[in-house]
Structures are given as structure tokens and as C-alpha cells.
């Protein structure tokens, strides 16, 4: 296992933990997802269990997909490449999704600052960016070491 793959898996696990903590905070504080102002979540638990997510977490189906991709990334060969490519994509998607939430501006404003929400938001965004960057590095390493066929 390469160093970049180890770091990618660590970033993914960190992201999963951050999303779980984000879900707990969202349920406690009624933080509905409102990506770009057009999701308008109504029921946080239902939104989390389906495909909307919360203001501080991705939806459960996406987290389960991320968990599966993380496990795949640890496997050799084609399965591992699928896992790495998937985590790279998930990192890009989560970065855009989290930064598109209005809570980003509210949490970092003096009047709306909440330390727990700010930490979870930072962990989620930083780990998603890390997944994207480390996914690219790992993908390049895997491609360079793959035997050429043809």
C-alpha cells in the first residue's frame, strides 16, 4: 500500500466521522440542507436518510457509497482503482456540496459563530479537499505502476 493511498483512506475515514458528527449536530440544531438556496429541506432525518443531506453532512446513501469505495480502494488491481477513482470523485462532489451550503457563511460570521459547527464544517471541507488531492496523487501512482497491456 502506497503512502498516498494510506493518506487517502485516512482522509475518507475522517470525512465519514465528520459527516456523522455533522448529522448529530444538524439533528440537534435543526440544520436543514439548503444547497445554493434551492433544496429547502423540511425534515432533517428524512433528508439525511434520502438524498438531500443536512447542512453539515452528506446524505446516508452517499456516506454508504463512500464507505464502500474506501474498502474497495484497499484492494489490489481494478477494484482498488475503482475505489480510488470513486473517492476522488466523492471528494470533489463533497467539496462543492459543502461550500454551497448557506451555513458556511453563517458559521464564520461573528453573529452566527458556533464552535462545534465550525469545527465540523472545517473537518468536512478539509477532508473532502484532501480526498480530491490525495485521490489524484494515488490515481497517478497506480497508473504509473500498472503494467502496460496492449
Feature-to-residue mapping (PLM):
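Cytosolic juxtamembrane helix and N-cap/initiation of the first transmembrane helix
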Residues: 1-28, 137-143, 150
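Small-residue packing motifs within transmembrane alpha-helices
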Residues: 7-8, 62-64, 79-81, 87-88, ...
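Interfacial segments of alpha-helical transmembrane regions
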Residues: 3-17, 75-91
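Membrane-water interface at the C-terminal end of transmembrane alpha helices
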Residues: 122-146
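Hydrophobic transmembrane helix segments
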Residues: 14-60
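Hydrophobic alpha-helical transmembrane segments of integral membrane proteins
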Residues: 85-118
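Juxtamembrane helix-break-helix junctions at the cytosolic face
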Residues: 66-85, 139-142
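Alpha-helical transmembrane segments of polytopic membrane proteins
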Residues: 46-66, 114-128
Amino acid at each position: 500500500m502506497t503512502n498516498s493511498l494510506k493518506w487517502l483512506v485516512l482522509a475518507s475515514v475522517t470525512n465519514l466521522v465528520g459527516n456523522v458528527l455533522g448529522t448529530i449536530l444538524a439533528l440537534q440544531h435543526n440544520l436543514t440542507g439548503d444547497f445554493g438556496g434551492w433544496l429547502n429541506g423540511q425534515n432533517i432525518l428524512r433528508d439525511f436518510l434520502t438524498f438531500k443531506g443536512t447542512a453539515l453532512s452528506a446524505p446516508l446513501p452517499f456516506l454508504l457509497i463512500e464507505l464502500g469505495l474506501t474498502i474497495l480502494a484497499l484492494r489490489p488491481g481494478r477494484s482498488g482503482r475503482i475505489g480510488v477513482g470513486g473517492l476522488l470523485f466523492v471528494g470533489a462532489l463533497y467539496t462543492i456540496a459543502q461550500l454551497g451550503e448557506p451555513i458556511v457563511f453563517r458559521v464564520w460570521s461573528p453573529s452566527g459563530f458556533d464552535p462545534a459547527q465550525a469545527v465540523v464544517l472545517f473537518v468536512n471541507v478539509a477532508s473532502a479537499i484532501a480526498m480530491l488531492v490525495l485521490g489524484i496523487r494515488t490515481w497517478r501512482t497506480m497508473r504509473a505502476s500498472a503494467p502496460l497491456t496492449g
